Amino acid sequence: MILFLLALIGTLIVMALLTIGRLGFGRSEAFQARKFLRWFIGYFIFNYILGLLILYVSEPALTGPFWGWQWVLWPLFLSSLLNLLGFIRPMMGSLEDISAASQGRRSSSSGRRGIPANTSRGAIAAGIFGLVVAAGVGLLVAGLIVVFTTWFDSNAKALAAIPNISMQKSSDLPQTDPNHIVLVSQDVAAYKGQQILGSNGQNLGSSYNIDPATYTLQSIRQHLYYVAPLQYNNIFINLSNSSTPGFVIVDAENPQAAPELCTDGAHSAHCPTNGASLAYLPGAIFNQDLLRHVYLSGYTYGKLVDPTLELDDNFHPNWSISLMQPTRGYTGDALSEVLLVDAHTGNVVKYTPKSAPTWIDRVMPADTVTQYLQWWGLYHAAPWFNPSGAGQQATASNPQLLYNNIDHPVWLVTMTSASSNDNSSTGVFLFDTHDNKATFYPLAGLGIGDNINQTIASTRANIRNYTVDSTQLYQLYNTPTWVAIFVQKTASGSIYQAVGIVDARNLNGSNVQYETTLSAALQDYQQWLVQQGNNQNGGSTNGSTKTVTGKIERISSVQQGTNTIYYMQIAGQNLIFTANLSLSPKLPLVQPGDNITGTYLSTGSQTVAFQTFDDLTINLSSTPTTPPGGTPTTTPAITPTATSAPKP
């Protein structure tokens, strides 16, 4: 195993330094081969065992300054202390004598203290030399590396330039496909997953659990799901089992869909035919630990970060791991390789970031994206030393996984000014999940932080005071839009109750379109935009504008809040058309049989909203008829005549 070779190399480095200290600086002591050999073998064994332990437990990445071999400073430091024990003991005794004398007490020791006769002065020299090297390299040199790679303006600009950022002139975000909006939060997924854990009659909950933080959003076969692994309840369960039974799948687009528990032998279209059990997990013991398994497989030359459980198109479980290497001293981690680990067999395959399978949703870690954008916000338009904070920006939220395109998600990060009193955005980043590329949209003035949830929760429709569990920023109908999930909190998670949609530029509780289903909320929102005249009367969600002309077959009106909405069926059309009263004053007069014309957006939905509307049957442009060569005639007024009461 590579671990034994690395430990051997580390031990040789430590012993070489200690030997230099003993023989080079302890020359006052006569060289005794047997004594030296006994000392060398003893410390060699000690450092080899200690090196194995450090490598096995901490898995240091062999990259960056000193090629990552600074981990040997710990064995060197401990070995140096052990070599100094013969000197430290009498020194501590002398300090005790001095302390006693200063307090007017007699020392408890008798006689003069000194270094024991059997103490090797060469060992003391080795210990002192080892401590000097450890302190010099671990503190002084490491500190200088940090200073000369991250301090001062040139280094700050270099850090800000690590992400490849393009600036958009338009604030319009890419359009979102409304058919793939996330309606299940991580807490809702955790609640549904907990319910399914004990549903198969195997009492799996007594041995395994699902960490709510491990639910991972991902696209599988053009649909969004949450996936979470079953984990061991305790070390004793781990010791008695070589794998966990499998994983849980929760539909992220449909909160009413039943979750599924995938184990070996499970019969479901959303479960693999075999190999559902997970032999390697983050946090498992010994070689079952995922990162340790990968490290021991030879991937020691980078930082192994962000292990993510992802299912391929056959719903087979795999772990994706990002292998990062620093570009500026100890920092500036850049994605070097993508490792794909079969969660069932442990087979490891490496890819370059651009050649990774397309079904892997993300290989750029969220923490790395945050660090990149923090550097960019601090230094791209401001100097390194900037106590005023002028020109600086900061991330206003953690990266959110956004599926504008179902097959190509991006990290969405809202930016704000560096001022802690600022509650609005300066722009929005969309960061590629497969490459070090980001696009900045100058979408300024959006609400940020807790005020988004609080404002949306204040809508009058939320009469039961449900909690806003999550919000995501989408581009719907050419409008930046917050989509929020209303939930009822429980001890084991959250229960979906409703969805709220609001224009991000007009964040107000009274503007929230609150419905129990997404389709109804989208319909309300589109009508609200039409009424407000926003963004081309409702804009497009990846649809095209079409014109329809035909005869009304059915028409009916409904009241939605303060809006009157007309629903129409037109001959020869397989769609239901809606129109807000604000579109035309003719709408209350429309009857079956009237010929109408209008434009709408074809988005694939069965219900579409008119952007323009006119009833061709109702002609309001006609004028009184004038006889040839004459003047318009008026109709004589009819005056009612009184009648006498009948005689009795």
Question: Where would I find each of the regions flagged by the language model?
Answer:
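Nucleotide/phosphate-binding sheet-loop regions of phosphoryl- and nucleotidyl-transfer enzymes
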Residues: 1
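Soluble extracytoplasmic regions of secretory-pathway and membrane proteins
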Residues: 4-632, 636, 640, 646-648
